[in-house]
């Protein structure tokens, strides 16, 4: 068992980039694992029931999936350098930004990636 968090995520995944940036900002030691077919079926799917990115394996052997859930859980475990604003209004705006970025920006990214010939 490793004493570092294992971060399973693709380099091209915006959600994996979100959790990777979060872990770096919080200065939480982790191993960044770009998963392969072996990881999918022998680790990730067995642990969480499906193949999904990003996924974290914690040092205690537990697993977390979904970028927002990962960040919420990690904020509880590592409260220093919090990403949560102090005021209620700022919290609301922060959550709205997260909702927009998680649900709407990937559609724009896919559009620009696949509908512009130069890309």
Where are these regions (language model features)?
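GST-like domain detector, emphasizing the conserved glutathione-binding G-site
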Residues: 1-119
